[in-house]
Amino acid sequence: MSNRGNLNLNLPPSSGKYTVGENVHFELSKEKNNSTNSNPHTSSTSTSNSNNTGIGVAKSLSTNDNNNDNDNQQPQQHEQIQSKAKSQSQSQSQSQSQPQTQVQVEQQQQQQSLVNSPAAQLAAKKRKKKKSKKSSNNNGNNSNTNSNSNSEITNTSISMPHAFLNNPDEDYPTSRVIKQAPNGDVIVESLDHVGGTYEDHLHDDYSDEDTLHHHLRQAPHQASNNNHIHNHSHTSSHPLQHTPNHLHHASHNANPLTQHISASGASMRSHGHNDAHSNLWDSASLEEQEKLKEFWESLEESQKLDLVKIDKQSIMKMFKNETRQHLQQLLQNGVLNNQNASSSNNCACKYCGRRNNIIEEELENIYDNHFDDIIDFIHEVRDINDLNALPGLLFGGFHMLEEERRLQKRKQLHNEHLELAKSSNLQNQAHIEEIRAQMDKLKMNQRQQSQSQSQSQSQQQRDVQTAQSQVLSKDSSLKNANTSMNKQHTSQQLLQPQIQAQGKNNLQQNHHTHHHHQQPLQHPTVQISATFLSSNPTETQLFNKLLDPKLFEALESLDLQKMKEVSHFDPQNTAHINMLEKAGSLREIVRDLHNVDRNHLEKGMSYVQNMGKLFSNIASLNPSNPEDAEKIMTGQLNEQFNQGLSTFAEDLLKNDGSSFISMMETLSELRSAREELLKEKTPYNGLLTKTPAATSQDREQQVQPNHSHWLDEDDHDHEHEHEHEHEHEHEIDDEDHEHYCCHHHQHHHLHGDEEYDEEDEEDDEEYEYGDDEEEEDEEDEEEGEDEELEEVVEDDVDEEILDDEEEFDAKNASDTESEISEEEKMQEIRRLFLIQVIKLFQERLKSAYKEKVSKDNTRKLFEELEAEEAAKREKEAKKLKQKEKAKERKRLQQLAKEEEKRKKEEEAKRIAEELHAKQEQLKLEQKKKKEEARLRREEEKKKKLEEIKRREAEHKRKVEEQIKHDEEQRRLKEERRKELEEKKRQKEEEKKQKELLKKQKEEEKERLRIEREKQLEKEAAVSKSIPQPSPKSKHVMKLAATFQSDIPSKQNQAQNGNQSHLPPQSRLRQDEENPQKTFANSVFSAKEYNSIYQPLPGSLSNNSSSAALSVGTQLSNFQALSHPQQQQQQYSNDIYLPSANLATATVQSPRSAPINLPNGTSAVGVSLANHLSLNNSSQGSPWTTNSTLSSNLGSTGLSHGQGQTVSGVNTNLPSSIGITSGGASQIFQPQPQPQLQPHQPQQQQQQQQQQQQQQQQNYFSPFNSFSEPLVGEPFQGIVHPTTNINNSTTASSSTGAIIPPMNPSGNIWNSNIGATATNAPASVSRNNSVWSNNAITPKPSEPSFLSTAGRSSSLWGTLANAPVASSSNNNSNATANYDNNNVRSLGSSSFAPANPGQHELEVIQTAIYNCFQMMQNSNQLEFNVAPLMAIFSNVRSLTNKTQLTVNQFLNCCVSNSLYQFDFVYDDFGTVTHLKVGLNGLNDHNSVNGFSKSSTTPPLLPISAMNSKILGYTQQQQQQQQPQPQPQSQQQYPLQHSHQQRLLQLFSNNQTILSQDVTSSAFATGTNTQGSSYGQVQLGAVSPAFARTSPPGLFPNDIPLLSTINELNSTPSTGTGTGTGSGVGAGTGAVFGSGIWN
């Protein structure tokens, strides 16, 4: 919108705005217009008109760069132009209309802010006085200098502008004002949004300018680094910063680069107020800065990158423009003209303009060679590519960047010092001891040192008293803190007296000294300061966070007591004494500092700091005094030091107040009076030449230790290189001016009043026009204030002193420059380029922002003008509207009527529609209800139909069930009828069989006689070849010889052998034709049962649930014979049981009864099922018998010829069974049997046959589940054919053993009974069994193999059906095989007896008991009973009998003397659970002379039972798994397997596992002279069987195995007609015939 220029349009103070309604045109006089050509920034601007309306203000302004300097100008007087639009339009109504233009007024903020400032006037006076003195020294005429100054002021002043209207006839809007922005732009604002007055803007501009120039001045100070070479009096551009006269000087021989660096910094300071970029950045308010930041953020990425692009051309252009602008400024100010006489063309600085090209070339070379280094440095300071952080870089400038780095380094150094302090505590203690030793030495020279010190102290006191006369208004709250802090300060000066004494002569000679000359002597003080600071690290850290150390230094340097003493110099300050005394502590000033905002807080802190620099008390304590030094060294001040730190930090955070602010306001009102007092009191000038060195040295010694801990990196680099001179007027200061060089303190003491006035003026102005910058460096403020004070003092300095200082300063400057390293030069170069880069960025952003602001202002102006035009058009429209209102009213009334009519019509129409809709809705609802009713009726109809169907189905089901029930009843009746027919048929067959038996017995008698003779001969021959047995073996054989059984006839064996080789059809046909013969072959002799266990009188149960036999009824003995004669011979001497008592069948409930069997364990047989039927007897359930039997073996009276048994078969009945009928107890009394004879009486045979028939016919099953015999199960006996070597009458050689075949299907639930062998008769089917056995109902002509007709009603009577076992000897053992026909081999002696059913029963019962115990131990029982299927599966897997069925398993669960089995039935009578227990043994009972032990036999381990007892190994068990075999091979698998196991277990010297002997399998007998004997060869036995018999049961500790295997089997020989000899002679029966079975 406008171009920036160096123009000065100062509006009147009373009115800071123009009223736009006054069409004003400004024209300035042409006095200074010729100078504008030299300034490239001078502009005379005019803007185009806009729509013939707006502002027609044209300004032709002359740029006056002398106003930028503000050193030689008086305040500009401005004319306030106010006239009304109407009067101007009337007075100039005939003027031509000129194009309306908008004047873009541009002005520097500095010039605007200094117009009416009293401070500016005072500064101008002081500078004029200084210049007049200098010009008088140069020219000798003060009046000429003053006239020249006045002429300069006159020449550079701006003429009063004349205003006139461009277009008086035009109607200009009066709603806007034109005013000037702080950046020089013309702002057109609405009256509603105008805020503030001109004075307010001037106030803000002044304060902003003041603050910014501190920053712009500080940056080149840092860059200069005391290396600048200036020999000319160039004025400073800072309005309040008077030209300092204590600048550093260097020789003119310095290189051009150094000169340019110095000049560049000075140029930036002097020209900073009229540079294009300075106003925007230096004087921008916070609001405008925020706008600039928002503008930056609104830019796009590409635009931001364009703004921050760094190129060589732009940077070099910045250097050149800066140089040219500075030269033009100097020309305008007449500086070069004044210096031509003295310097001519010998000056080498850039201000003379002679070496500009060389400097520019040098800069270009530096840029080319060190571009990367410079860019790295810029990035190190702040990443300029971080576009978001760039506004902070632009506003903060180089000074802020350096401050950030300084703070970081300061923190780093502080942390390092803390660590060093901690690590060096012990070393410090040692140093303190050394210092104490030095203090002792100092006592020796105390007088000499005290004299020299007293002189310097007295001089200092006088100077301090003089300088402190004007500080009575200072806050007395610093008094108490000053006491402790002065002690702390003095504690750091213990070694200074010696340093002062050494440096005094040098100071008096040279008047100045360098700090680095005394650095080696000050390190003990540094260590002491570090010790004090590190002794309390917590307080030190808090202090470092809350307050800058330099401010703390200033606070501790105050001595307000002495300020009060000199208060009489200013009588006006006496009114403030009471306020000073009331403060009492540091709280007041801390509260004031805490209560103000940030900028004012920084001002106040700087104020207090400068106060401390001026009025620090040096002589409060005497460091040379031994008492004071000892007090300090012993740490007594440490507590006060820490207390001061804590108090200051606490008050800074907590307290508040306004005393500090009110104090500063009061001081600002008294500046004028004190200024006059300063001018009058100047008698202290003479002191300058007396003690400046001493005062300076004392100040340096007092300040230097205090900063030893807080110096940053730059301070350490340059703290010893500051030398201040008083002649040169260039301002080249660096950041370390706060170290209070000697001239500062000298002038402070001499001119305290004047300095205080200047300082108060400075501070008050800073407070009044506060700084709006984000941060402010206190060091820079100190520097500026020091320079101002030095300027004031410089006016009173004699010319001779200035000359001397010039010469001395030149020497020191050359020395200083020689010490600058190349690295420092490169650092300054980097800083210089960084400054230029920042300025470049600022210029670009400023230009872009100004362009945007200009466009926005233009747009706003056009918008306002358009709004005004719219207002005019609106006025005209109003008139038209008013005219049209009447018409509109009429039209509206008409429309209202029409609308009302239309509404009525619509309402009627709407009502009709609603009525119609309601009717439609009602119809729909009625239709819906009808539909719902129809659906409900259909649904109910469906439900009724479904109910009818359901009832019909239920009725049909009931009818079917009734039909099924009727059919079942008919079937049951038919079955009963068939049963009766079958019984009848069986009776008939039995009659026929009896007749056949009679014939067979007769033939058998003859055959047996022949066989005995042959057998005796053969045995006599074999006995000769038998080796002599051991003593135990002989004893057992003797016992066994007495119990030899009769030998079956050879005829029976041959007949059975012939029958076994017949095909199944032929054998079945034979069985049907001759059932009596088949039955005779399937049973075995059970005479042994009558010889041991016979019921005693009264032992039968009186329970009504048992069926009884008549008195004298005894258990039948069945012998499976091959011929009827053999069978008749067998049964000729048996005990007869009345068959009439067997016909009665009563339903009995199952009940367990204890059956005492003295056997501790059981020998395992193979075949069980074909010899055991548990519930076929009509006399009741076998396990409910409660009767006991008493052994009456001695009264048996069996003859020698009647003890006929089958080899290896246990035919005795060990359990006691009581059979009652009608509640009467019957006693089974053993009949005296004569010796075995070849023939038996015919009557006895008939009676035995009748008993067998009755047992076969009497079927009974309480639950119709066990009515079938086990013969029909897979264990049904099969007669195996055997070969007979000789024709002896051995039963074992002539008969085949019944071996139960395995169930090939393996189905325990559905065992096919029809797959039995031919010789095994069919069994009755179980109709109501839960397992539904598919049994084949036998034909009426077929006798049941285990029917109740031929059995006893007792449990053990079922064993009478066991056939005669074959003693066919397939044994390969030569020592045991004596005679294949007469002697039992090992294979059939123990585990393959002729009666395998009993043997198998014991195995299964033992396994059942062990499984029950296992389940009980593992908590698998259910209410102390085991589930049937669980224990059944365990027993089957344990015994390796995979084809064992549930029916067979239940038949084996028979209670005996050893085990007791209890069943649990369900509602249908099916067994669901089983309980197994042990029965107790009676000690008073004895069997065959052996007492039965009551000790429960130990249970064998399962592994022993499974492998040891059965003789299995795991490999053999796997081999013994049932395999599908042909029928011819399945007939005798178990017998063969038993023989193999016995061969492996009991073969000679092959399976000897223990020395405990057990009976082997050898039993022989002879019939010599009517005597029988038995020989038993003992063999080794498994440890599992060793000594397992009950104690005392057998003599000579015969093991249980021999009892089971030997004594329990019937010898194969021993039948004859003679009288038996040996043990058991006269009994004619065997020793162990079934006592364990």
Swiss-Prot record:
Ranges of Low complexity composition bias in the record: 34-53, 64-113, 135-155, 446-470, 1176-1199, 1234-1257, 1282-1299, 1514-1534
Superkingdom of source: Eukaryota
Keywords from the UniProt entry: Coiled coil, Cytoplasm, Stress response
GO CC aspect terms: cytoplasm
Subcellular location(s) of the protein: Cytoplasm
Ranges of compositional bias, category Basic and acidic residues: 24-33, 717-734, 871-887, 896-1021
Biased composition, class Polar residues, residue ranges: 1-17, 471-487, 692-706, 1049-1063, 1201-1228, 1258-1267
Pfam families for the chain: NST1 (PF13945)
Composition-biased stretches (Basic residues): 124-134
Annotated region (Disordered), positions in chain: 1-155, 221-252, 442-494, 504-523, 681-734, 746-825, 871-1036, 1049-1075, 1176-1299, 1512-1534
Composition skew (Acidic residues), residue ranges: 754-808
Coiled coil: 855-1023
InterPro entries assigned: NST1
Family label: Belongs to the NST1 family.
PANTHER family registered for this protein in UniProt: FI16631P1-RELATED, SERINE PROTEASE-RELATED
Function comment: May act as a negative regulator of salt tolerance.
Protein name as catalogued: Stress response protein NST1
Source organism: Lodderomyces elongisporus (strain ATCC 11503 / CBS 2605 / JCM 1781 / NBRC 1676 / NRRL YB-4239)
High-level lineage: Eukaryota, Fungi, Dikarya, Ascomycota, Saccharomycotina
